[in-house]
């Protein structure tokens, strides 16, 4: 029989009763076991994520089946390479106790434990987003969270923002479509969303977008189906994912990329780094490159899912960033959020720790349990050959820029072409669902805001605006 101990291995003789002065007397301060239990309970929770708070996770692997050596030198993308990973799904707006089956964007964040360090691809289940400049991000998230006075979600705030920021129309159309409430995490696609870069052995740059197509098929819920499910099970997505993996019904996704040569970037006809737009598949076709599978559940949700920490700043040789303003901001904001939420040394936790060799001069900090390896010197530059040194062969190619530093308003104000193309792809039933979902989300919204929004939908398609108006009258 295992002996019960406290956090420091001290054997506990009585775990049922507090130490008191007499049977009916007050408690004694020397009851260190009671104090330890209470103090630990007070600190069991860390700050929840300000976005993507409610989530589920699983381990798996990615296998590359295509030859991408012409585009990238990243070892993870060598043909036949198998790389372990951890994937965290999430909703965006809701708190940690929110229901899984709400109408919301889903997070799709992957940590690849590559031979060259961790690569984090922090995406969503949509290829676009509501905004293209991170300067608006805090304000946008405020519209999705609770009103500070009423502590209620506000349709008025959401539609006020969307109608004043028409670049959001593409993502709003996706969110309000039949795909706005996936039936489960297994039955939705994933996207890197941002534009990233590939760099090959010749130090040539290519622009790339990542896609993950579910092999379980797309399944969605209507508003009514979601409401009925939430009434029965607020953890429906978590339950579905966990049970599927436990039953060895491992979910899979086909991995695809869109690749565009640096010299061809102007041929798109719009800013290729605009997160509110997609790259048309007719111009930049999808390329199948492999398969991703999830095959292992976490053993401890808090340790492995709640403390999982992702950041787009984690990249490996052969993969780089782009001038996408949203991506640029996330490079800072994500690791900053993790340091606040988990601590300075969050990277040392098992779920976040690289499986490759780590050689750094970063030392100490709260909760640092790593052994220091640089015996020759603890600073850099230094004179000792056996200490870690920089390697200039990993420098990225130059990125040609032009213009002066100022706060630039986007030059591309075509907010309607891509939402129109998406709307025209929908069948009659999908359009009807779209109209009713938008009308339902406009409940309680000021008339002037609805009027402003309808003018934008009219510019996408007269049928779009007409359908919403009709649904609003019911």
Swiss-Prot record:
Q: Which family does it belong to?
A: Belongs to the catalase family.
What's the name of the protein? Answer: Catalase
Please report the organism this UniProt entry assigns to the protein: Campylobacter jejuni subsp. jejuni serotype O:2 (strain ATCC 700819 / NCTC 11168)
Q: Which cofactor does it need?
A: heme
User: What does it catalyze?
Assistant: 2 H2O2 = O2 + 2 H2O
| Domain of life assignment | Bacteria
CDD domains, alphabetically? catalase_clade_3
What SUPFAM superfamilies does the entry give? Heme-dependent catalase-like
């Amino acid at each position: 029989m295992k002996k019960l101990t406290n956090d420091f291995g001290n054997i506990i003789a009585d775990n049922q009763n507090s130490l008191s002065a007499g049977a009916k007397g007050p408690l004694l301060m020397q009851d260190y076991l009671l104090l330890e239990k209470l103090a630990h309970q007070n600190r069991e929770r860390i700050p929840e994520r300000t976005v993507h708070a409610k989530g589920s996770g699983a381990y798996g692997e990615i296998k590359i089946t295509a030859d991408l050596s012409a585009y990238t030198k990243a070892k993870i993308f060598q043909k036949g390479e198998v790389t372990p990973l951890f994937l965290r799904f999430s909703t965006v707006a809701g708190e940690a106790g929110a229901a899984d089956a709400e109408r919301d964007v889903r997070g799709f964040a992957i940590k690849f434990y590559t031979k060259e360090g961790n690569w984090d691809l922090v995406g969503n289940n949509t290829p676009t987003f509501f905004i293209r400049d991170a300067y608006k991000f805090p304000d946008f998230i405020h519209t999705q969270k609770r009103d500070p006075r009423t502590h209620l979600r506000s349709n008025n705030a959401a539609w006020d923002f969307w109608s004043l920021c028409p670049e959001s129309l593409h993502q709003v159309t996706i969110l309000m479509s039949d795909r706005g409430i996936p039936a489960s995490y297994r039955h939705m696609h994933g996207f890197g969303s941002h534009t990233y870069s590939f760099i090959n052995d010749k130090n040539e740059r290519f622009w790339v977008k990542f896609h993950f197509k579910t092999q379980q098929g797309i399944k969605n819920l209507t508003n009514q189906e979601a409401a009925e499910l939430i009434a029965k099970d607020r953890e429906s997505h978590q339950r579905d994912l966990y049970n599927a993996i436990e039953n060895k019904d491992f979910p899979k996704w086909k991995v695809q990329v869109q690749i565009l040569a640096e010299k061809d970037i102007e041929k798109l006809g719009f800013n290729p780094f605009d997160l509110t737009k997609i790259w048309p598949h007719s111009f930049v076709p999808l390329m199948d490159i492999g398969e991703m599978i999830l095959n292992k559940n976490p053993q401890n949700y808090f340790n492995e899912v709640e403390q999982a920490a992702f950041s787009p700043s984690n990249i490996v040789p052969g993969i780089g960033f782009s001038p996408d303003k949203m991506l640029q901001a996330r490079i800072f904001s994500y690791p900053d959020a993790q340091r606040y939420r988990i601590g300075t040394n969050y990277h040392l936790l098992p779920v976040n720790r690289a499986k490759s060799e780590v050689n750094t001069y970063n030392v100490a900090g709260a909760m640092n349990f790593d052994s220091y390896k640089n015996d020759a010197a603890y600073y850099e530059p230094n004179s000792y050959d056996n200490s870690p040194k920089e390697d200039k062969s990993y420098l990225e190619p130059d990125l040609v820029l032009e213009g002066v530093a100022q706060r630039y308003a986007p030059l591309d104000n075509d907010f309607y072409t891509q939402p129109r193309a998406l709307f025209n792809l929908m069948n009659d039933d999908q359009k009807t669902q779209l109209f009713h979902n938008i009308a339902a989300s406009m409940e309680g919204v000021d008339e002037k805001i609805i009027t402003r929004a309808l003018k934008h939908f009219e510019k996408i398609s007269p049928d779009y605006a007409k359908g919403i108006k009709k649904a609003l009258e019911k």
